[in-house]
């Protein structure tokens, strides 16, 4: 199965631009999207609505990862460190999601 999520550039409707992203902007957006997920779950929304809100959170996480790369972090090292942390906490993998970044900025 091949899944695609976009690394966003700019929004032509709202004039948001991820080239000048900041941790404050990401924090605010993450809080907004998190609240929308919580609301959808509490209201027992249809699962499609919950999925849409969860993917919005995922999109903000991608923004954060991109900002880390811009600040000099290596995603491979970060992912490896994260996976080791989970294994050390006793988690066993069920499957693996491979991420391929088509173009780097």
Model regions: which residues?
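Flexible "arm" and connector segments at domain edges
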Residues: 1-105
